[in-house]
Curated annotation (Swiss-Prot):
EC number assigned by the record: 3.5.1.5
UniProt xrefs under Pfam families: Urease_gamma (PF00547)
Listed GO MF terms: nickel cation binding; urease activity
Stated family: Belongs to the urease gamma subunit family.
UniProt organism field: Alkalilimnicola ehrlichii (strain ATCC BAA-1101 / DSM 17681 / MLHE-1)
Subcellular location, record wording: Cytoplasm
The protein, known as: Urease subunit gamma
Associated pathway: Nitrogen metabolism; urea degradation; CO(2) and NH(3) from urea (urease route): step 1/1
GO annotation terms (biological process): urea catabolic process
Disulfide pairings: none
Recorded superkingdom: Bacteria
Listed PANTHER family: UREASE
Keywords: Cytoplasm, Hydrolase
Length: 100
């Protein structure tokens, strides 16, 4: 299987997102990389499903709460930016204060 560097990055992010999802389901508090991966994956999947940029900006802020992450992690992530593939092309989605 030949993947472009961009496809490899997306696959790595998706794998990290799955790991974070499993840890969250076990009741474990997520660290910084896990939180970013989970939020990013949610945005990428929503975009792939055909949701709008505005919907994904809103949804990205509903993935995690402060109770879901380790102490101090929410403050470490002032925003998350991810390039997601929408039906009409690739767009940059920015979520400010994603962990509320």
């Amino acid at each position: 299987m030949d993947l472009t560097p961009r496809e490899k990055d997306k696959l790595l992010l998706f794998t990290a997102g799955l790991l974070a999802e499993r840890r969250k389901a076990k009741g474990l508090k997520l660290n910084h990389p896990e939180a970013v991966a989970l939020i990013s994956c949610a945005i990428m999947e929503g975009a792939r499903e055909g949701r709008s940029v505005a919907e994904m900006m809103d949804a990205g802020g509903q993935v995690l709460t402060r109770e879901d992450v380790m102490e101090g992690v929410a403050e470490m992530i002032p925003e998350v930016q991810v390039e997601a593939t929408f039906p009409d092309g690739v767009k940059l989605v920015t979520v400010h204060e994603p962990i509320r």
